[in-house]
Structure formats: structure tokens, C-alpha cells
């Protein structure tokens, strides 16, 4: 019957490459099992890879949140030295091995294993937002006088560029060591696990300012990604993020965000690690919102990933939204309705056409997380 499939594709001029596209479940619906709302049969029916008995961590998929002793200044708390150049590598690796043993247990674990370390970024310049603290303290390590001068005149671009260049020499080498030594250790003891870091590669396309949005990753970020090739060569499973925002973004812009990032993932894989498998994270909510993705946006996101030769996707969700029976039922209805429709549609050859850059906002009423209380 294969020839019929390919004939159909040729006649209608559509893309029908029979590539595997696997959906993984990284949503803590094990909490719902305790509330008598089971997702197990539904996920199995939809061919979404999940762990046995609905467990959050298990034989198919495990995420490890900052295992070890990563230097961090998250939440305004300085822990484990705060910055990579102040961390203790020996203690970190000892704790990392212990934490992974407790989480995976089985030395022969062969599922996806995601290390989620979001305390800082190895490219010094990319530490923005709350991470700006790493810049400020490293500036002071380099030269307190110049750091103070810049603090009093942040419009001095020449001084800023000098501080970033010199401070990167202090920060980036130990940051690289922490990332590389960590993957080397876990790959040594858990050889069959499919290791990777969450978040990488970064792109930073389609910025917040509407007049400065571009589908492509900024040129400087591409250059920085090229210099970070050591990271992309060190593990073969990539877990970047394609979360989309609704407020102040058109549906076309949301699609451009996903497509621009997929283009960069393709480029980096081709140049630095052709055997890498890429499973971008997709959140079923709009970023910074309690609104579910519309059918159109969920379909757009997954279709761009599939047509962009990604190997699949990881569906993510937060535990804080699944603490009550009614919240679990609400998500179940979304998966059984909207997500089912989208996933079944992706299997049809006639739907395997590349996103053309245009779309129409859904006319359906917005659907939000249910603000509910269980039986009193």
C-alpha cells in the first residue's frame, strides 16, 4: 500500500515524508490519579508517550530539576556560590550523581532524561532580565571602579561592551565546565538514557517590542550559538522551548516565533550534530496566561514542528494547575477535545503542508483554566 500513499502525495503536491513524530507527556497528571481523574487510557489512545501508571517520572520520561549543586542567584538567594566562577565543581558532581541515582534508580534507564537548569545561561551576554545580577557582580569582579561608573551611566555603550567582553572571560569558562562535566558524568553512569538540557538552543526571536520583531533569531544570537557548538555536540537530545504568547501578538506572529526557532534548530543540528533528536517543549497554555491554546494555535505549533523535521514534541504543564478534581477534569476535557482533534488531524496526509505564514484568529470563545472549588 506504500505506493498508493506516495502516489496520493505526488498527485496533490503535498509533503508526505514518513518521518516519526513522537509526542511526550511532561504534565504532572499523576496528581489527578489521586483525585480519581485518570489520563492513562486517554494518553495511550492518543499515542502520547507517558510513564507507567501515570507517574511523573518513569521509564519513558524523567525531568530532573537542578540536580546537583548548581551555583544560582534565583529568587534573590545566593546558593552554591551564586555564580559559576564561585561554585564547587567537586561537591556539585558528587551531589549530581546522588540526585540522579535517587531519581532514575535503574542504571539501565533508557528513556528521555531532561536536566532543567535555568539558573543562568552559559553565554554571559544572554543573562538578561532577573539574570542581570550575574552581569553586575561579574562586572565588579573584573573592575569595581568601572562597574560603578557604568551603574551611574548605563547609556555608555562603549563601557558596557568592554565590561561584557572582559567579564565573559571570567564567567563563561566555568559555566562551560559545569555544563560539560555534568553531562559527561550522567552519560558515563547512565549510558542508555537519552540525556539533554532543557531550553537549549536559545533564539530570542520575536521580542516583546512590536516594532522590533523578526522571525529570524538575531544575528548576534546565531553567532553565540555557533560559539556554543561544544554544548550542542555534547548530547544528542535537545529540548528547546516554543511557548507562545497571545497578548499583543497576532496569530501570524505566534507562528513566526515557532518557525523562526525551528529554522535555527535545523541549522544548528545540520552544522554541529546531525544525529541530534529535537523535541521542543510545547505548553498547552499561552505564556503568561491561564488561557488554553486555541485549536488553531496548537495545530500551528505542532504542524510547524513536524514539517520542520523535528522528531516530536514534549507537552508541558504545571503542577500548580492540577491540585483539584475540577482542574483535572478541565484539562482532561481539553486533551480529549481540542488536543485529540489536532493530533488526529496531524496524521492525515492532506494536512502535511507547510505553514504559509498566514492565519486567522479563532472565532471560538477563549477557554481559560477553570477557576473552581471542589465539593465543600
UniProtKB/Swiss-Prot annotation:
EC number(s) for this protein? 3.2.1.35
Q: Which residues are glycosylated?
A: 36, 55, 77, 88, 143, 153, 181, 214, 226, 248, 287, 321, 336, 356, 371
Regarding tissue, the record states: Female salivary gland (at protein level).
pH dependence per the entry: Optimum pH is 6.0.
Catalyses which reaction(s): Random hydrolysis of (1->4)-linkages between N-acetyl-beta-D-glucosamine and D-glucuronate residues in hyaluronate
- Where is this protein found? Secreted
The active site consists of: 118
Alphabetized UniProt keyword annotations: Disulfide bond, Glycoprotein, Glycosidase, Hydrolase, Secreted, Signal
Q: Name one GO molecular function term.
A: hyalurononglucosaminidase activity
- Per the UniProt entry, the disulfide pairs are 32-328, 203-217
Give a Gene Ontology cellular component term annotated to this protein. Answer: extracellular region
Changes after translation: Glycosylated; glycosylation is critical for enzymatic activity.
Task: Give one Pfam hit by family name.
Answer: Glyco_hydro_56
Q: What is its main location?
A: secreted
The highest taxon in the source lineage is Eukaryota
Q: Which GO terms describe its biological process?
A: carbohydrate metabolic process; hyaluronan catabolic process
Signal sequence segment:
1-16
Protein family per UniProt: Belongs to the glycosyl hydrolase 56 family.
Q: What else is known?
A: Enhances dermonecrotic lesions caused by venom serine protease from Crotalus oreganus helleri (hemorrhagic factor). Immunization against the protein protects mice against L.major infection; protective immunity is abrogated in B-cell-deficient mice indicating that antibodies against the proteins play a significant role for disease protection.
Q: What PANTHER family does UniProt report for this protein, alphabetically?
A: HYALURONIDASE
According to its UniProt entry, what is the function of this protein? Hydrolyzes high molecular weight hyaluronic acid to produce small oligosaccharides. Up-regulates expression of CSF2, CSF3, LIF, CXCL1, CXCL2 and CXCL8 in cultured human dermal microvascular endothelial cells. Promotes host neutrophil recruitment at the injection site. (Microbial infection) Probably promotes Leishmania major infection in the host.
User: What name has this protein been given in UniProt?
Assistant: Salivary hyaluronidase
Please tell me the species this chain comes from.
Lutzomyia longipalpis
Lineage of the organism: Eukaryota, Metazoa, Ecdysozoa, Arthropoda, Hexapoda
Amino acid at each position: 500500500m506504500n505506493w498508493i500513499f506516495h502516489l496520493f502525495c505526488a498527485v496533490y503536491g503535498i509533503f508526505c515524508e514518513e518521518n516519526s513524530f513522537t509526542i511526550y507527556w511532561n504534565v504532572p497528571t499523576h496528581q489527578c490519579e489521586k483525585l480519581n481523574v485518570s489520563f492513562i487510557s486517554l494518553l495511550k489512545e492518543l499515542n502520547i508517550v507517558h510513564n507507567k501508571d501515570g507517574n511523573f517520572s518513569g521509564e519513558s520520561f524523567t525531568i530532573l530539576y537542578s540536580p546537583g549543586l548548581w551555583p544560582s542567584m534565583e529568587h534573590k538567594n545566593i546558593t552554591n556560590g551564586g555564580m559559576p566562577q564561585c561554585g564547587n565543581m567537586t561537591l556539585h558532581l558528587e551531589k549530581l550523581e546522588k540526585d540522579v541515582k535517587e531519581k532514575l534508580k535503574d542504571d539501565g534507564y533508557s528513556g528521555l532524561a531532561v536536566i532543567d537548569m535555568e539558573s543562568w545561561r552559559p553565554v554571559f551576554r544572554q543573562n538578561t532580565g532577573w539574570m542581570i545580577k550575574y552581569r553586575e557582580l561579574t562586572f565588579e569582579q573584573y573592575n569595581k571602579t568601572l562597574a560603578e561608573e557604568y551603574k551611574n551611566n548605563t547609556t555608555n555603550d562603549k563601557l558596557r561592551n568592554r565590561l561584557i567582553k572582559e567579564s565573559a572571560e571570567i564567567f563563561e569558562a566555568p559555566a562551560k565546565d559545569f555544563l560539560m562535566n555534568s553531562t559527561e558524568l550522567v552519560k558515563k553512569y547512565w549510558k542508555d538514557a537519552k540525556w539533554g538540557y532543557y531550553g537549549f538552543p536559545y533564539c530570542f526571536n520575536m521580542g516583546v517590542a512590536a516594532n522590533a520583531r523578526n522571525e529570524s533569531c538575531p544575528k548576534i544570537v546565531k553567532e553565540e550559538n555557533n560559539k556554543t557548538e561544544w554544548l550542542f555536540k555534547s548530547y544528542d537530545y535537545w529540548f528547546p522551548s516554543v511557548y507562545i504568547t497571545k497578548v499583543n501578538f497576532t496569530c501570524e506572529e505566534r507562528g513566526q516565533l515557532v518557525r523562526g526557532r525551528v529554522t535555527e534548530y535545523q541549522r544548528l543540528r545540520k552544522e554541529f550534530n546531525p544525529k541530534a533528536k529535537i523535541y521542543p517543549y510545547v505548553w498547552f497554555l499561552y505564556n503568561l496566561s491561564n488561557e488554553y491554546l486555541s485549536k488553531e494555535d496548537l495545530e500551528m505549533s505542532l504542524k510547524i514542528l513536524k514539517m520542520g523535521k523535528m522528531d516530536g514534541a514534549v507537552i508541558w504543564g504545571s503542577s500548580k494547575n492540577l491540585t483539584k478534581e475540577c482542574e483535572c477534569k478541565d484539562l482532561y476535557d481539553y486533551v480529549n477535545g481540542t488536543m485529540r482533534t489536532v493530533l488526529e488531524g496531524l496524521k492525515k496526509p492532506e494536512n502535511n503542508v507547510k505553514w504559509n505564514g498566514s492565519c486567522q484568529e479563532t472565532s471560538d470563545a477563549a477557554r481559560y483554566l477553570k477557576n473552581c472549588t471542589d465539593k465543600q
